[in-house]
Amino acid sequence: MVGANIPAELAALPIESLIGKPLEAAVRAQAFAAMTTARFVQEVGLDDDGNVKTVTFKFKRKELDPETGDVTDVDTTVEAPLLTILPVPFIRIKDMTVHFNFTIKTSAQDKTQHDFASKLTAKAGWGWGSVKLTASYGFKKESRSQVDRSSELDITVNAVQDEMPEGMRTLLSLLKESIAPAGASGGGTG
């Protein structure tokens, strides 16, 4: 009977690779996400000279004149750093699950059949006689063996928008402090 050597097959499985390669891929994905964030800040937030890209908002603001009590429209301009109004992507892998299932199914069947048949014929005659003897033997053996192997690798990765790193939070805080509306007449208030 031909069968599977299950302990040997299980021992031959590259468990280090089956677990390690998905983990290595997750680390590479995390590094790729970090580089994507750096590229986003560089391409979206800074111009070619390294200066902060800004967006200018112009609008009319109502202002009360304390001496006359009149309300007037004042042209106001606000220049805001682009990075302060766009969500910066900080993606990280929150958790990862690796499931590996390896199944070996064996089945074997032996079937042996012996057939023996004999036939004896005798002739006897006066003087000169003849004897006829006939015998037959049959043997039939049937073996069937089947080994089914299947494996399944299931990887689940859960990525989330991470909290902003402290350095980026500090930088954006400084940029936000630089935002102040300015009146067109030069006497705008913050």
Curated annotation (Swiss-Prot):
Q: This chain belongs to which protein, by name?
A: Uncharacterized protein AF_0417
The family database entries (InterPro entries) matched by this protein are listed as: DUF2589
Q: Which organism is it from?
A: Archaeoglobus fulgidus (strain ATCC 49558 / DSM 4304 / JCM 9628 / NBRC 100126 / VC-16)
Pfam families attached to this UniProt entry: DUF2589
